[in-house]
């Protein structure tokens, strides 16, 4: 306990940036764009006060990770503008968000994402995941970390009913309306392709409820 007391407090900018980024991420997942935009402005302003482009790059990756978890996939252009100044862990994280991790990237990533990164980097070709593989690669960490791992695996071409259900369940349990709608829409398309009319109808009823 005495040792904890000797640690210097985090500077105000860092505390403010982290809090605003968390609020922005939650607002995005819940489908509250006005709050999301305001909080990202606060987070970016706090980081900008340091004049450090490497930290600004890290902040943009946090935003992009939330979008990836909600199945909004692009190349994270706001990070790309700062990419030359990003540190090695952030470079690896950006590749991971694009489902293109290199063989040595896993050790640079948050531990919750390492299993998925190793799987993607090692596989010769994309393949549906079994229930056990889904649990192994999406079962660690906080709900957003788990949803992100599922989304990156999906982006890498590892779609399976078990993976889609994991994404749906994670988003539903947190009440993340926007993320849940994205996962349900994909699950509905999969059910329709398989000719499972009952499943597709059930999913569409869930989507109708979300839109109320």
Segments predicted by a language model, with ranges:
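Bacterial Sec signal peptide processing site at the extreme N-terminus
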Residues: 1-23
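Extended amphipathic alpha-helical interaction segments
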Residues: 89-176
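TPR repeat positional signature
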Residues: 20, 39, 55-56, 60, ...
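Structural register within alpha-helical repeat arrays
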Residues: 23-24, 43, 63, 148-153, ...
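Alpha-helical linker/edge segments of TPR/alpha-solenoid repeat scaffolds
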Residues: 63-87, 100-109, 192-200
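Short, charge-rich amphipathic alpha-helical segments embedded
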Residues: 43-73, 173-182, 192, 211
């Amino acid at each position: 306990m005495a040792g904890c007391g000797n640690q210097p407090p985090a500077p105000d900018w860092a505390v403010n940036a982290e809090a605003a980024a968390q609020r922005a991420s939650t607002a995005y997942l819940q489908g509250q764009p006005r709050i999301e935009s305001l909080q990202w402005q606060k987070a970016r302003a706090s980081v900008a006060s340091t004049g450090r482009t490497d930290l600004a790059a890290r902040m943009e990756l946090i935003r992009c990770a939330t979008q990836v978890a909600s199945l909004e996939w692009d190349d994270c252009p706001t990070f790309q503008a700062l990419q030359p100044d990003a540190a090695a862990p952030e470079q690896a994280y950006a590749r991971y968000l694009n489902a293109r991790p290199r063989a040595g990237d896993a050790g640079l990533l948050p531990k919750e994402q390492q299993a998925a990164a190793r799987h993607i980097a090692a596989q010769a070709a994309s393949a549906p995941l079994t229930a056990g593989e889904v649990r192994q690669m999406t079962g660690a960490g906080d709900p957003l970390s788990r949803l992100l791992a599922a989304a990156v695996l999906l982006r890498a071409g590892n779609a399976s009913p078990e993976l889609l259900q994991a994404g749906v369940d994670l988003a539903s349990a947190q009440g993340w309306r926007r993320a849940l709608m994205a996962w349900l829409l994909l699950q509905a398309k999969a059910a329709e392709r398989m000719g499972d009319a009952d499943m597709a109808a059930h999913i569409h009823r869930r989507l109708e409820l979300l839109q109320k």
